[in-house]
Amino acid sequence: MQIRVPQRNRGRTFPHRSSHRRTPIHILEFLAAQPLLTLALILAVGLLIGKIRFFGISLGAAAVLFVALALSTVDPALQLPPLVYQLGLAMFVYAIGLSAGSEFFAEFRHRGWKLTLFMIGLLMLMMAVAYGIIKLFGLDEIIGAGMFAGALSSTPGMAAMVEMLEGIDDSVASEPVVGYSLAYPGAVIGSILVAAIGAKLMKVNHAADAAEEGLVSDPLEWTGVRIGPGINGTIAQLPTLAGEEIIATRVVHSKTFHSLAAPNDRLHEGMVLVIHGTPDALERAIAKVGKQQDVPIEDTDLVYSRFTVSSKAVVGRKISDLDTVRSGFIISRLRRGDADVVPEPDDVLHYSDRVRVIAPANRMSEVRRFLGDSERSLADVDLMPFAFGLVIGLAIGVIPIPLPGGNTLSLGFGGGPIVAGLILGALNRTGPIHWQMPYHASRTISTFGLAIFLAGVGTSAGVGFRQALTDPASLTVIAGGFIVTISSALVCALVCMPLFKLKWDEAMGVAAGCTTNPAIISYLNGQTGTELATRGYATVYPTAMIGKIIASQMLLLALIA
């Protein structure tokens, strides 16, 4: 006796079981009907595998992509709604833009514009390489154009080609997706292989490179200095006079009487100050402005303490605008993330910054209230600015940009949010709106956005990858895309290191920025433990994102012309 299962299992038969036992349902079919459970499972398994080290290398969040790809290859019905990866990518790139905004525009004025021009040239070169591969191997033109987008991880570029083809021949509008799906996994694997193998062969010292670039500071110390003859100016001008990143915090009048070093106080011969900086900076500064002086600080009425910045009245403002001396304290050290740095007057305070302050003991409670120092306030994150910023970014993403021939393109859900994030991150605040978020909240949102993006895009690529297992022609598309990916990463290393004097990690960050692939930058950050790769990534990401949308459509037009 057999029981037929209705509706979606119609036509399939199962052996009769006892009435008290439920009819078994295939686990993959069950997951296909439960996308939320599927998403959670992919995230859990992927993040678990990402912690495992293979030959000293761990994939981190990138493992989520491969778990999603594996599941959807076994059963193409395992698809997550497009909204999942669209929202994930938008959250990730917007958070990246917020954190990198100030540095991006500051860097652009120095060498950022050079890297922007390099990225434009690189995309043109890769477009030519892809064109040659398609013609040499006789690949289908439309699938080949999709291969180019997949090899450089350009989901917006692929979407732009689909939209363009819908206006030309709707019957082939889905073919770029096939090429994209086949090439996309190789884009992740290829870039990670170049970064990992290159770092091993070149014996890259990640921490030393980051320190040389000023991204990892030596521990800060303090010492006393007696100002020598011929040193004229104010305390605020002392770093300039010394030519070093130092800060004066105390004027020493006697063993028991110290006062705060006000910026407008005049320097004079014999004046004794307490200054802070790295050991090397202190040594060089003292040699220029005077001589070292032993200063006991235990028996004075000035004390020091660390507070966390959480006050809305302080966040987003420059230290110089706070007039801290009038409020009874001086900020001697600024800790953001894992690094202590000497604060500068133009530094803008962010949520969750840790500051070391010096103040009279009887005013320390007042200083605490001024800065906030409330973990509860930081945990109560105001998501309104983040949501409003996403709205601005997504709105920018849908604005049509006209092209010759009557075609249009848009920045999409990946390009628009990063443009908005960079601008708003550089602004810090607009009136009462604080665009920046607490450090931990920003990292959590960006990591979660990255993970759900990888889960969503991984399941969408499974159909094409499954075809490759049975169609030899698909293997040619995979190989062609892999060549484009490897070529772009190698060009970044071979050009950026000698021409722009970039370290290996930053050059690989530029390569990751070329692919605009969050999985690659996640891997690089996990392996290096520094911000070098992120700096390179953020510098070229906007140009690469926009450039690939244009390049993908230009390649398609060149192939079908």
UniProtKB/Swiss-Prot annotation:
Residues 292-373 form the RCK C-terminal domain. Its main location: membrane. GO terms for biological process: carbohydrate metabolic process; potassium ion transport. One of its GO terms (molecular function) is monoatomic cation transmembrane transporter activity. It holds the Pfam family Asp-Al_Ex. Keywords: Cell membrane, Membrane, Transmembrane, Transmembrane helix, Transport. GO terms for cellular component: plasma membrane. InterPro entries: AAE_transporter (IPR050144), RCK_C (IPR006037), RCK_C_sf (IPR036721), Transaldolase_AS (IPR018225), YidE_YbjL (IPR006512). The chain crosses the membrane at residues 27-49, 54-71, 83-105, 115-137, 142-162, 177-199, 383-405, 409-428, 441-463, 478-500. The keyword Transit peptide does not apply. The keyword Translocase does not apply. It is a multi-pass membrane protein. It comes from the Bacteria. Gene3D superfamilies: Regulator of K+ conductance, C-terminal domain. Belongs to the AAE transporter (TC 2.A.81) family. NCBIfam families: YidE_YbjL_dupl (TIGR01625). PANTHER family: K(+)_H(+) ANTIPORTER SUBUNIT KHTT, TRANSPORT PROTEIN YIDE-RELATED. This is Uncharacterized transporter DIP0570. The lineage of its organism: Bacteria, Bacillati, Actinomycetota, Actinomycetes, Mycobacteriales.
